[in-house]
Design a protein with these regions (language model features):
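Bacterial N-terminal signal peptides
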Residues: 8-17
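Compositionally biased alpha-helical segments
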Residues: 18-91
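Predominantly the structural core of cysteine protease catalytic domains
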Residues: 323-427
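Active-site-adjacent structural segments surrounding the nucleophilic cysteine of cysteine proteases
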Residues: 83-101, 107, 216-222, 229-340, ...
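Noncatalytic regulatory segments and standalone regulatory/sensor domains
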Residues: 220, 238-273, 395-465
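Short coil-to-beta-strand transition motifs
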Residues: 26-35, 188, 196, 410-421
Length: 465
């Protein structure tokens, strides 16, 4: 579908605004003139690249009056360039020409994206926008900002996709066709707008492993890479990262086994009441979709310093219409990706007992637990967690816990299959801590190990060194 004439005129003006001029003549107060490329302008100085390729900083007050005026004009023009990006996207993404020196919380504040997770080194902000909201004149279904060491690190925007599309309980052929057309339409619109603004894209591929590898179209602007991914009948997404990260195909710096082992051990928290649990696990809110498996894997992978995105993992898990995913498909696809990061995924068919959980939590390793999350189970978990928060007499709580465990029987509801993380244990009370991908309110709930075994599917998974 062609864009309207008004939008085409807007894009034409954006193209003109985004053009980068090179070869600027500047002179000092002595009258010496040189040809340079202006790289960066600060209030008191400018960064320039000389004809021989060397880069240096020069004090603005040492320039001639004409050059100072010219630099001020360039500064004004440069400031307007980030505004054209904001106008193109339709959101206040930038406050200047560099997103990557902004703190993640400030970016999220101006975007009005809510905090999802905050750890010692990582943060994330996520929003599921209303149906009438638009980015790049296209409806986004999910928007996320990731921070690393306090600074903005990655923006992920998911447009039309199989998991978020509105279907009946039994999808009709017309609904499926509408989804396919929406994915195709969104891709065409995004490609046209980005190409009109930045020129023809480069082709690039990301990822390793069946179902995880993506073919991307890439546009660059002033250290920002705009990466559009589309899978037929699956999804369309746009990621914004630094050009340096994009050149490295989004891979993070690999940690040695020793460095990662030290990091995971440092994440272990021991409380006076005997609780032992793992901190600094990123939270992901899967939203209304049945994305518990990919969301849980994203949390674990990011905890292990491996970049991950639940939408891409969902594609690897052969997402069903409406959002259901296959654990076995995700594991088969993720296994090679994890191996490429020098890590190993293990499946263990062990009962849910405190001594089993303790072996891995004491190494700083969370456990992916497949279970049945019925209404009865969640009522039980919520009630126990609420009661637990008010406890001061832990000896009495131990007695109460043991008595309740013997009297409580939870049934396996096969219609409520779920995956979550086991993140802690209490050896004295016989409890384990679980964490679900439903947002901060579900980051830590405590249940008895006996009841956990009653609703377990029989398998646990972990990623090790």
């Amino acid at each position: 579908m062609k864009l309207s004439t008004a939008i085409q005129l807007l894009l034409a003006s954006l193209v003109a605004a985004l053009q980068t001029s090179q070869g600027t003549a500047i002179s000092n107060k002595a009258g010496t003139t040189i040809e340079v490329e202006i790289l960066n302008i600060e209030p008191e100085r400018i960064q320039i690249r000389l004809e021989n390729g060397n880069e240096t900083w020069f004090e603005r007050d040492q320039l001639s009056a004409d050059s100072q005026q010219a630099i001020s004009q360039i500064e004004t023009q440069e400031q307007s360039k980030f505004e054209t990006i904001n106008q193109l996207f339709g959101i206040p993404l930038l406050r200047d020409n560099n997103l990557w020196d902004d703190t993640a919380d400030k970016v999220a504040e101006r975007l009005n994206w809510r905090l999802e997770s905050q750890t010692a080194t990582q943060s994330s902000y996520r929003v599921y926008p209303h149906a009438d909201f638009r980015i790049l004149n296209t409806r986004p279904y999910a928007c996320a900002l990731y921070g690393a060491n306090e600074h903005a690190d990655l923006v992920s925007i998911v447009f039309a996709n199989k998991g978020d599309f509105n279907f009946s309980d039994t999808p009709t052929e017309d609904e499926i066709e509408a989804m396919q057309k929406a994915i195709e339409h969104d891709e065409d619109t995004l490609v046209e707008r980005l190409t009109n603004a930045f020129g023809q894209p480069e082709k690039q591929s990301f990822g390793t492993g069946r179902g995880i590898k993506e073919r991307l179209q890439r546009w660059d602007w002033k250290g920002h890479a705009f990466l559009l991914a589309s899978q037929e009948d699956e999804y369309v997404s746009l990621r914004i990262m630094s050009t340096e990260a994009a050149d490295n195909k989004g891979r993070s710096k690999k940690l040695s086994d020793a460095a990662l082992r030290k990091l995971t051990i440092e994440n272990i928290i021991t409380r006076p009441n005997g609780d032992v649990l793992i901190g600094n696990i990123p939270m992901v809110n899967q939203g209304p979709k049945g994305y518990c498996v990919p969301a849980t894997f994203e949390r674990y992978l990011r905890y292990m310093q491996i970049p991950a995105d639940m939408y891409l993992l969902a594609m690897a898990g052969q997402t069903e219409i409406g959002g259901g995913t296959s654990l076995s498909s995700i594991i088969n696809s993720v296994d090679s990706y994890i191996s490429s990061q020098s890590r190993t995924m293990k499946q263990l068919n062990e009962p849910i007992k405190v001594r089993t959980i303790q072996k891995y939590i004491d190494k700083g390793l969370p456990i992916i637990w497949t279970m049945f999350s019925s209404n009865a189970y969640n009522q039980y978990a919520n009630q126990r967690t609420a009661e637990r928060q008010a406890i001061t007499d832990w000896r009495a709580w131990k007695t109460t816990t043991q008595s309740n465990a013997r009297r409580t029987e939870l049934r396996k509801d096969i219609m409520s299959a779920h995956a979550c993380l086991i993140i802690g244990y209490n050896k004295d009370t016989g409890e384990i801590a679980v964490s679900d991908s439903w947002g901060p309110s579900y980051s830590e709930r405590w249940i008895c190990a006996e009841q956990a075994e009653q609703v377990s599917q029989g398998s646990i998974y972990l990623i090790s060194f």
